[in-house]
Amino acid sequence: MRSALPTFDEIWQRKFRHRLLIQAQQFPADTVFLIGCSGGMDSMLLLHLMSELFPHKVRAIYIDHQLQSSSRAWGVFVQNFAQQSHIPFTIQPVIVDTGNLENQAREARYAAFESHLKSNEVLVLAHHQQDQTETVLLRLLSGSGVKGLGAMKEIEQKKNICCWRPMLSVSRQQIEHWVEHLKIPYIQDLTNFDTTYDRAWCRETVWPVLQKRFPKMQEAISRTSILMQDADEILHEVLQQDLNQCGDLNHLDLSRLQQLSLARQRQLLSFWMKGKAIYRPAFEMVERVQQEVICAKADAKAALHWNHHYYVRYQNILYRVEKNKYLQKDLVSNVVSTIELQMDASLQLASGVFQIQPMQMGLSPQLFEQPLQLLPRQGGEKIHLYGRVGHWPLKKAIQEAQILPWLRHTIQILALDNVMLGVFTPKGFWLAQSSYCEAGGWQPNLISDVNYLRVEQNS
């Protein structure tokens, strides 16, 4: 005869269900939960529990990586379970790129999740405590820092995905007992035992040895990940303050950077180089930026490429420049174009957007009636800047204005019949002294620079 008192497992299960309900209150009332279900024991239990606790607010998706002959049948298996439980269901095949199979499959999977998530939906995944511990161990072996050792968070905003992992504190043994008790069917993926994959090797080879020596290892390492998440949050706050003091997303003032301790310099560089990407650069890449760019000779044209950007030093400032933008500096244009201007017209050029506006001193309105030439800079030109004495080499004026070397190719000369009227630059229009200058004239006024243009074109 069964005891009237609840068993330990039943008590724990009730507590877990209650915790699930409490966590769900962090999301808006109209939230729908998209369950990523592979058909494995963990995700099948999660799908069952979520559909019980949140009826009519759950749907499921199976990502078919098409890497195994059985993958399609697994999708049908999950589909049948979902239909029996009246859960809306989607099968999404993906193509996994070559390379590191585990990483590429993960990238394809999350891209598929993102494409299916609606604005009011949260992605719910069945990662458990052993998954978390394996992640920490593998990242430790790959040399990860504080953020990497924080591993997975229970609730995390990842690009455009809000991800919830409610089972991170649940052990695999607890999941096994619960699935057995509820008699939930599931699939056994044999690749989980293939030790050619790092995670399977960790699980099948390393785990038993460590578990035997350290029985509480799983709970301890899982706790460490939480402490690392706390440390990473504090570090992020400090580094954001340092970044605000030393620069912004695109540049760092090296004189201010070097006032920090060496440890904070290294951390800030890593944080800054990451930009809006998911991961920070490798330790070695940060060291290379310090040694090959920051510490290079003053007259050296040092530049280092990483993750679609070049890191370049100019006038004791370290810049982060998009690859295609930086490489354009070597392009020399011979194209001469003709333009006609009128008052208030906008002109989009390589150096920015200019608007024709009235000025106390400017060019004659008579020029509106004539075709003007836009000439590329060839080198050797001289300019008599309005308000200054004598002719100056245009190159010297550009250097004096500290126009960044990789933007100088955008400079164009406005001319009429071989008379220089002015120069379009990323820092504005430079009026040249000529017979066409007069009081109450007009000038092109820079209203958005080349950086703004780049952002607009990529948005």
Curated annotation (Swiss-Prot):
Which Gene Ontology terms cover its molecular function? ATP binding; tRNA(Ile)-lysidine synthase activity
* Major site of localization recorded for this protein: cytoplasm
The catalytic activity, as recorded, is: cytidine(34) in tRNA(Ile2) + L-lysine + ATP = lysidine(34) in tRNA(Ile2) + AMP + diphosphate + H(+)
One of its GO biological process terms is: tRNA modification
Instruction: Give the UniProt entry's GO cellular component terms.
Output: cytoplasm
Entry's InterPro entries? Lysidine-tRNA-synth_C, Rossmann-like_a/b/a_fold, TilS/TtcA_N, tRNA_Ile_lys_synt, tRNA_Ile_lys_synt_N, tRNA_Ile_lys_synt_subst-bd
Sum up the protein's function in the record's words.
Answer: Ligates lysine onto the cytidine present at position 34 of the AUA codon-specific tRNA(Ile) that contains the anticodon CAU, in an ATP-dependent manner. Cytidine is converted to lysidine, thus changing the amino acid specificity of the tRNA from methionine to isoleucine.
User: Family per UniProt?
Assistant: Belongs to the tRNA(Ile)-lysidine synthase family.
List the protein's name: tRNA(Ile)-lysidine synthase
Gene that produces this protein: tilS
